[in-house]
Amino acid sequence: MHDMTSATIQVWINQISTELNAPATLSDAIAAADLKPPFAAAVNMQFVPKKNHAHHLLQAGDKIELIVPVTGG
């Protein structure tokens, strides 16, 4: 018997295969990556503004890039 309450999707976060509970948002992926701000986020090479992270639904196979700015000299 298949339990529909534990459905997951597989996405890529910074080139690492990751399973998230479905439905999943970009915010869920960021939480799974345990990344601290500041950073920029893109899904399938498209920048997603921070205000949209909680509403941006992910699909299986999405490629998420979380980019941290480089500082220093």
Predicted regions: what they are:
Residues 1-72:
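Ubiquitin-like/PB1-type beta-grasp interaction modules and other compact soluble beta-rich domains
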